[in-house]
């Protein structure tokens, strides 16, 4: 996990990397494999995190456009270097920052998903009900990532099997497809 987009906060966390170096690594990875999906987690409200640090993280997220992003609010965790710091960011501020990053990521996720419309993916079917089957692409983890929703329409798909699915529409966190 990258955990933050501010070099100052990364230093306080003892992550051993700067925001600039992280940006460079992400760029190199995407240059080598433009189709790669990059996922990470971030922490908002780390002790000492000021508005400028939070804005650096927002800029970091906007610049790197992560395919999948989880955000957590800071809480003391024994055995970490940060446990020795005073937890000085109010919970209301942490929650506001969490919501801001998630709102930003929702827009990014929707943009990324829109780019998938018209493309075909191998989709693993996870489950179904009377109206739809639900699966995921090779880029997605179960339960936490995008689902591909496939209307039943006389299809008899088997859970645990892969199918070629053309994406016909996109939402922020889900795709809708049809079996080819």
Where are these regions (language model features)?
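Conserved non-cysteine loop/helix-boundary elements of the Radical SAM core domain that shape
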Residues: 1-68, 74-93
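Terminal RNA-binding accessory module
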Residues: 84-180
């Amino acid at each position: 996990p990258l955990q933050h987009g501010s070099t100052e906060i990364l230093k306080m966390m003892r992550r051993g990397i700067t925001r600039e170096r992280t940006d460079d690594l992400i760029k190199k990875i995407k240059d080598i494999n433009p189709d790669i999906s990059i996922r990470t987690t971030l922490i908002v409200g780390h002790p000492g995190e000021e508005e400028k640090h939070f804005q650096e993280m927002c800029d970091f997220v906007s610049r790197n456009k992560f395919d999948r992003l989880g955000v957590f609010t800071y809480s003391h965790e024994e055995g970490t270097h940060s446990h020795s710091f005073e937890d000085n960011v109010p919970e209301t501020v942490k929650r506001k920052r969490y919501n801001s990053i998630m709102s930003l990521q929702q827009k990014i996720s929707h943009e990324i998903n829109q780019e998938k419309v018209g493309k075909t993916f191998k989709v693993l079917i996870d489950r179904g009900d009377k109206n739809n089957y639900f699966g995921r692409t090779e880029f997605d983890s179960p339960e936490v990532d995008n689902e591909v929703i496939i209307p039943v329409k006389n299809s008899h798909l088997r859970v645990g099997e892969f199918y070629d699915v053309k994406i016909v529409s996109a939402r922020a966190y889900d795709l809708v497809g049809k079996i080819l």
